[in-house]
């Protein structure tokens, strides 16, 4: 194979109004290299992948793959034939093998004809068997089932037209991986995957022999799979040979040499670096340490010190000893049992990470805690001092015609944030909307910017118990890191639905895991500790994702 599978020479891209989103990028990609692409929202990461996939040709410079290289591209919103079933969509990826198997059956049937040209049939049989052998085609059904389980695809006969956006993405990703291209271009491949499927994808891409260029905020992927980090910063492409942890070290050193305005960002990076350097044992004691120092987190002096953080979660009323108690909870939808006999109690200071397949009932639990839905049986008891800040309050009610500042402030110069008052522009600035960005229309925002705006609206309530439903979706790593640091310093409790394992390892003191047939397990510890516990008690197979099974309600 050639030395490089893809080369870019002085590539630039201008977007309205005359903004150079990419400038003078010259890069060469080695065969088999695994590259993670980092950068703030709006830095041009998706644009870079569209250029590499040959979709965006309106560029300066030259972007050229090696001849005969097969490129597979996963956009954020993949297009599938709405008339097809899941099975038909997936089989498109292996159509050569499917057609060969079908034709081989026909050839076998033709042997029964005494007038057949047996030499011609034998030659065709040999050619078909060669195709099938090369792709392990006789085990095709096993391969498809394994891939469908790993990415938790909907039923084979489900119509694409009836699937959610997340389900379509999983089907598109599965199809792409089965195509086995020479180079994979993946735009946020972990979005809409649960933590177990993300871990499976990480192992798959680690063993994949081709080149991978992935935009992702999944830092375990960037640490365990990526051999290169490509950072897009103010239009420049800055390559770094090494994984995420080593990139973080050099980034910290680089920021140390830059202007003092980077001080807050450097402080945020140093907190994450401290966690990385502790190793597994030290990391696992962090959750227990948080519970132990809850009183310190609550002190006014401590909160004042942390107001300079990049993202500051305003404290709500002081929490009493009783936070949340769930007893014998049961909830079904139609004939599906989502939650069966769930009981747990949350201590003050806890941050509970909630994991499990999409559609298992994680968001339903939030709606029951906030009183929007009622359980079939069992009780949910909130402590008297608990003030909820629930993620569903604002998610779908943002006005696209308003500016960022208007959407958060309601046009007020001074805002009430929890129990305190502060200038509204200063509060909005805490969510990395600085200066002119506060004048952007909501409808013009990227997914990550909408995520930050949503957090700004949610957190102004000043609750002491946060319910966060996939807050990490679409956030760039800078904002993710800031959110982690803010949660770790927050003098309250939080329940967080997330598939981001690094995020869960840094913040979670407990894990709530949705499993098959309505079973939900409550565990004290972070995500990695929970994985180790599952391996010890159930064996390594317990970590392999499978399509969810719902217990049916007896009629």
Curated annotation (Swiss-Prot):
Q: Which PROSITE patterns match?
A: ABC_TRANSPORTER_1 (PS00211), ABC_TRANSPORTER_2 (PS50893)
Q: Which GO terms describe its cellular component?
A: cytoplasm
Its top-level enzyme class, in one word, is hydrolase
Output the superkingdom of the source species.
Bacteria
Write out the catalysed reaction.
Answer: ATP + H2O = ADP + phosphate + H(+)
* Claim: Transport is one of the keywords in the record: no
Where does the ABC transporter domain lie?
6-259, 324-550
UniProt entry keywords in alphabetical sequence: ATP-binding, Cytoplasm, Hydrolase, Nucleotide-binding, Protein biosynthesis, Repeat, RNA-binding, rRNA-binding, Translation regulation, tRNA-binding
Name the reported effect of residue 470 to Q: Causes growth defect at 18 degrees Celsius in bipA deletion strain
Where along this sequence does the record place binding of ATP 1? 39-46
**Region spans: PtIM:** 242-322
Where is this chain's protein located in or outside the cell? Cytoplasm
How is this protein organized at the quaternary level? Monomer. Probably contacts ribosomal proteins L1, L5, L33 and S7, the 16S and 23S rRNA and the P-site containing tRNA(fMet).
Query: To which protein family does this belong?
Result: Belongs to the ABC transporter superfamily. ABCF family. Translational throttle EttA subfamily.
Q: State the name under which the record lists this protein.
A: Energy-dependent translational throttle protein EttA
Source organism of the structure? Escherichia coli O6:H1 (strain CFT073 / ATCC 700928 / UPEC)
By which gene is this protein encoded?
Answer: ettA
């Amino acid at each position: 194979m050639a030395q490089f599978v893809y080369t870019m020479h002085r590539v630039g891209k201008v977007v309205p109004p005359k903004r150079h989103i990419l400038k003078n990028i010259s890069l060469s990609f080695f065969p088999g290299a695994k590259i993670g692409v980092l950068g703030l929202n709006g830095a041009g990461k998706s644009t870079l992948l569209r250029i590499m996939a040959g979709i965006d040709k309106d560029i300066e410079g030259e972007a050229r793959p090696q001849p005969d290289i097969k490129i597979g591209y996963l956009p954020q919103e993949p297009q599938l034939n709405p008339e097809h079933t899941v099975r038909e969509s997936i089989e498109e990826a292996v159509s050569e093998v499917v057609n060969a198997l079908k034709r081989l059956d026909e050839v076998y049937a033709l042997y029964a004809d005494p007038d057949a040209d047996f030499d011609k049939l034998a030659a065709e049989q040999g050619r078909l068997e060669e195709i099938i052998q090369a792709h392990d085609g006789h085990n095709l059904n096993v391969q498809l089932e394994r891939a469908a389980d790993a990415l938790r695809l909907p039923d084979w006969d489900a119509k694409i037209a009836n699937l959610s956006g997340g389900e379509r993405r999983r089907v598109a990703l599965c199809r792409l991986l089965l195509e086995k291209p020479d180079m994979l271009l993946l735009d946020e491949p972990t979005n809409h995957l649960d933590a177990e499927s993300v871990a499976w994808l990480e192992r798959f891409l680690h063993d994949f022999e081709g080149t991978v260029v992935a935009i992702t905020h999944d830092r375990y992927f960037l640490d365990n799979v990526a051999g290169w980090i490509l950072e897009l910063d103010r239009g420049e492409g800055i390559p770094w040979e090494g994984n995420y942890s080593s990139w973080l070290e050099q980034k910290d050193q680089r920021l140390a040499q830059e202007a003092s305005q980077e001080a807050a960002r450097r402080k945020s990076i140093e907190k994450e670096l401290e966690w990385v350097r502790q190793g597994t044992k030290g990391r696992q004691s962090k959750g227990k340490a948080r519970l132990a120092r809850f009183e310190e987190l609550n002190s006014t002096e401590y909160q004042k010190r942390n107001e300079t953080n990049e993202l500051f979660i305003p404290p709500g009323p002081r929490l009493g000893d009783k936070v949340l108690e769930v007893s014998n909870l049961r909830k079904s939808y139609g004939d599906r049992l989502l939650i069966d006999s769930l009981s747990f109690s949350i201590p003050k200071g806890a941050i509970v990470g909630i994991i499990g397949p999409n559609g298992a009932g994680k968001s339903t639990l939030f709606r029951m805690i906030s009183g929007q839905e009622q359980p079939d049986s069992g009780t949910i008891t909130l402590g008297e001092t608990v003030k909820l800040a629930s993620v569903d309050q604002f998610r779908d009610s943002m006005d696209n015609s308003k500016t960022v500042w208007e959407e958060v402030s309601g046009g007020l110069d001074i805002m009430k944030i929890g129990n305190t008052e502060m200038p509204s522009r200063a509060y909005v600035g805490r969510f990395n909307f600085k200066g002119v960005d506060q004048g952007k229309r909501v409808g013009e925002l990227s997914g990550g910017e909408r995520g930050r705006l949503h957090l700004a609206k949610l957190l102004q309530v000043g609750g002491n118990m946060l319910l966060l439903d996939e807050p990490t979706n679409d956030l760039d790593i800078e904002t993710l890191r800031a959110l982690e640091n803010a949660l770790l310093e927050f003098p309250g409790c939080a329940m967080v639905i997330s598939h981001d394992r690094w995020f869960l390892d840094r913040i979670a003191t407990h894990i709530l895991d949705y499993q098959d047939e309505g079973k939900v397990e409550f565990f004290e510890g972070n995500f990695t500790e929970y994985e180790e516990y599952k391996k010890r008690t159930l064996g390594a197979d317990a970590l392999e994702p499978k399509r969810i099974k719902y217990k049916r309600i007896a009629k």
